[in-house]
Regions:
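Extracytoplasmic cell-surface/polysaccharide-interacting catalytic and binding patches
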Residues: 1-167, 182-272
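Short, well-ordered surface patches within globular domains
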Residues: 171-177
């Protein structure tokens, strides 16, 4: 997991992706991305801001040279050293910036939500490991410890004749905010959204320790997943790999049953 080419570097506003993983959006971008060691991508809208090649920053557009967060991302790119000490604490966490203001914009009282659901704010990790690719051939980013456990669990399931697929892994606060904004635009009420999605900042996906799991031929993130051999196998074996079902029926958080949502939570990292 210490291969710098397989690590996503994360800051409050900008992500630094390894070169070769993002698709170019036009010929101009394609030429720059082709030789990039890193691509700096704005988290809020996914826009590519700049590339880094041989330690040199090159904005994709002149106006992007002063984009907020670019300097912070570049400092991380230049100074990053992967941690070699095992354990969840080996990956630094980002400060919870701007989140309360953006929750207010959605009409969510963070303190009230936390009190009602028992969910805590979840910081994003400073870096994530490439854990393969999801069902849609998108890079799957997970906390380094979860990535190792996921690989071991995939192999164990395959030996038993069960195919597990990742549907999604790490999601930033900005990504979760986008889910809410799009659903609100479609006319879905905030109360209804909160029954199926944790409020931005409160999702386990922010930690990189959680992922949605599927199996071939089964639609993603549907309750019908519980009727599959893959779910039966997870119920019997996931705990041995450190994974737990986060939202069973009747969970105390008020979130609908999600048989597909599993989080890496070995006893040693959960206080017992």
């Amino acid at each position: 997991m210490n291969d710098i080419r397989a690590i996503l570097l994360n800051t409050a506003l900008v992500e630094a992706w390894p070169g070769g993983l993002l698709r170019a959006r036009g010929n101009h971008d394609a030429r720059l991305l082709a030789g990039a060691d890193r691509v700096l991508r704005r988290k809020q809208d996914g826009r590519y801001l700049a590339v880094v090649a041989d330690g040199v920053l090159q904005p994709l557009r002149p106006a992007f040279a002063t984009a907020p967060g670019l300097d912070e991302a570049m400092r991380l790119v230049k100074g990053f050293r992967a941690h070699r000490r095992p354990g969840v604490e080996a990956v630094p966490l980002l400060p919870l910036q701007r989140l309360r203001e953006r929750l207010d914009q959605l009409g969510i009282d963070g303190d009230d939500y936390a009190a009602r659901t028992g969910l805590a704010l979840v910081p994003e990790p400073q870096w994530l490991a490439l854990a393969g690719f999801d069902r849609y051939q998108r890079p799957l980013w997970l906390h380094a410890n979860a990535a190792l456990a996921w690989a071991a669990m995939l192999a164990d399931a395959l030996r038993a004749g069960v195919i597990l697929e990742a549907i999604s892994g790490y999601r930033s606060h900005d990504y979760q905010l986008g889910i809410f904004e799009r659903k609100i635009e479609r006319g879905i009420t905030l109360a209804d959204i909160l029954t199926v999605n944790a409020a931005p900042g409160y999702s386990e996906h922010h930690s990189g320790l959680a992922l949605d799991v599927g199996t071939p031929g089964e639609p993603p993130a549907e309750e019908s997943f519980e009727a599959t051999p893959a779910f039966d196998w997870l119920q019997a074996n996931a705990a041995a790999h450190g994974f737990k079902l986060s939202y069973p029926r009747g969970n105390p958080h008020g979130i609908a049953y999600e048989p597909w949502h599993w989080a890496y939570a070995p006893a040693s990292t959960m206080g017992g």
